[in-house]
Swiss-Prot record:
Pfam families: ACPS
Gene name of the record: acpS
Protein name: Holo-[acyl-carrier-protein] synthase
Family the entry assigns: Belongs to the P-Pant transferase superfamily. AcpS family.
Residue sites binding Mg(2+) per the record: D9, E58
SUPFAM superfamilies: 4'-phosphopantetheinyl transferase
UniProt cofactor(s): Mg(2+)
Function: Transfers the 4'-phosphopantetheine moiety from coenzyme A to a Ser of acyl-carrier-protein.
Keywords recorded for this protein, A-Z: Cytoplasm, Fatty acid biosynthesis, Fatty acid metabolism, Lipid biosynthesis, Lipid metabolism, Magnesium, Metal-binding, Transferase
Gene Ontology terms: biological process: fatty acid biosynthetic process
Catalytic class of the enzyme: transferase
Catalysis performed (reactions): apo-[ACP] + CoA = holo-[ACP] + adenosine 3',5'-bisphosphate + H(+)
């Protein structure tokens, strides 16, 4: 296997909290998939959840080599967790098409957060 894309993003959680305080749920509705939205509404720490999802979606867009533009949207990336809690990245729409065009056969994602920051790294392999 060869790495064909790598993206990392770090988010200051207080920044996301400020956006949520100013604009309510608009950011969450814009970046989360339907499944993630349901999880966000039930989450014990919704701002932290949102910050981690924002970071992973930015990291994934960077791994694809584009960022969020040229037809890519935040809701085309979705994070689910396996039975052990490991994050799994799913791609839809233009994001999935671009990954296929690049020849990606495997996606790896890791998320981490501390008191002030959330970060994510995404690797695409073929």
């Amino acid at each position: 296997m060869a790495i064909i894309g790598l993206g990392t993003d770090i988010v200051e959680i207080a920044r996301i909290e400020g956006v949520v305080e100013r604009s309510g749920e608009r950011l969450a509705k814009r970046i989360l998939s339907e499944l993630e939205w349901e999880q966000y509404q039930q989450h014990e720490k919704p701002v932290r959840f949102l910050a981690k999802r924002f970071a992973v979606k930015e990291a994934a867009a960077k791994a694809l080599g584009t960022g969020i533009r040229n037809g890519l949207a935040f809701n085309q990336f979705e994070v689910v967790n396996d039975a052990l809690g490991k994050p799994i990245l799913r791609l839809y729409g233009a994001a999935a098409a671009l990954a296929q065009q690049l020849g990606a056969t495997s996606l790896h994602v890791t998320l981490a957060d501390e008191r002030r920051y959330a970060c994510a790294t995404v690797i695409l392999e073929r």
